[in-house]
């Protein structure tokens, strides 16, 4: 006979023990603390909940069922479905018409129908203020005082026997007669009220100190900066005049009959060559010319691009050169030159001798004529250039007749005095300088700084 073990009975839970022993007061302290959530873990949660909020998760010493209500899944409310298709129209209620109803519908009620049963409504009348009338009827009379004026009679007539002389222009005849009323309280005579209004002039006068209107200063047009004198450009001065008209002749040997336009010029050098001008070596591009003014001169400039090195991709590497030549200087102010007249304005014939020949000359004896020297008639001066008439002796044969002609007067120029060196009145004596003291120039006070030698190789340091 097999031995049967007794069935194991389940122990009561802490909640069941708390319900039976709480009334009698025999509950163990751990059961009371567990049921009333007063254990050490519950106290830590209470103290930590002062700074941290766990959202009512029911964290405690229970069985982990999520508290009394358990765990509830978090769900979001579904969106309402949007109906598709046309919406239904609300029904229209139509009144039915019976066979005995009238088919004519009157829009306006007949005004001839009198409702005898209804009474007409009369609105109540409220009482207003009372108007008091007086029995005495006295007309209103205004007290108007009449102002007395003195009457003055004035008559003006024109007397034909007396006429006042006119100053500027003749005055028309005036004949008038009438009465002028003047007030006893005022001393001026006026027929109506007059308002004094100052006259405004519309003539605008201006001066240099106070202009009448403001003329806006036009904004200066910003000129492009050429940058011809930057550090990136090599400055080369060209003295060949062909640089102005045909610069391509300085780079390559072209056709001299062809003259290109003033545009950028490009050159291709397939082989090594020497240009006509060594300054234009390896020039592959010459930009268009630019005329500028610098330091009082007119300068003709062109920028050139050298093609000293080419890469495999075909790009050339080279410096930029500024070729320039000075055309002419710019004078600050034009020189004033006094022009001398070619013919003298005043003619002085006092010291002049003209050559006149008798219109009816007689026979000339050749054997008796003398040939004087020209020095006795021609007078010359070394330091004066005054022109005048000179008498020239003529030794004519007997068969040639001389006719008198006009006098030729040359312009007179001012005489230049001769240069005489000034001889000093005092005798010239030699000057001897002797002494041991001297003054050093201020620029030599500071000694020159000696440059420190910097070693570039390790061999210099070792030495």
From Swiss-Prot:
GO terms for molecular function: DNA binding; structural molecule activity. Transmembrane segments: none annotated. Belongs to the papillomaviridae L2 protein family. This is Minor capsid protein L2. It holds the Pfam family Late_protein_L2. The keyword Disulfide bond applies. It comes from Pygmy chimpanzee papillomavirus type 1. HAMAP family: PPV_L2 (MF_04003). One of its GO terms (cellular component) is host cell Golgi apparatus. Its main location: virion.
